[in-house]
């Protein structure tokens, strides 16, 4: 509403390599399913399994989890409102937590 855009696109971007923005349903079981699924795909331990961790950081898994979940989402703006389907919401996924991070929001349209 603050942008005044009636028709266009809204970009929401996680501005860090170990965080993600995605769209899904806000349901507790689904959240736990995501946590379990991501941990199976890219387990945090053993730390030594990731070559990236040889740099002194222990977040190789966080980089992979971000890649799986994605960097950004784009939502249509229709009639001045974000055009979501039923149950859709925007979520921020934090996979490391070692430093402050930003989210970029850009609204483009008329």
What are the residue ranges of the model-derived segments?
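Active-site histidine-anchored catalytic micro-motif
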Residues: 1-110
């Amino acid at each position: 509403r603050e942008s005044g855009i009636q028709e266009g696109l809204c970009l929401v971007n996680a501005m860090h390599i170990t965080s993600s923005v995605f769209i899904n349903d806000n349901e507790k079981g689904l959240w736990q399913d995501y946590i379990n699924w991501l941990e199976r795909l890219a387990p945090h331990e053993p730390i030594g399994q990731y070559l990236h961790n040889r740099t002194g950081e222990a977040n190789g898994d966080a980089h992979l989890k971000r890649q799986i979940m994605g960097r950004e989402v784009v939502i249509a703006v229709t009639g001045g409102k974000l055009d979501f389907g039923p149950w859709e919401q925007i979520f921020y996924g934090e996979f490391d937590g070692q430093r402050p991070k930003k989210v970029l929001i850009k609204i483009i349209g008329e």
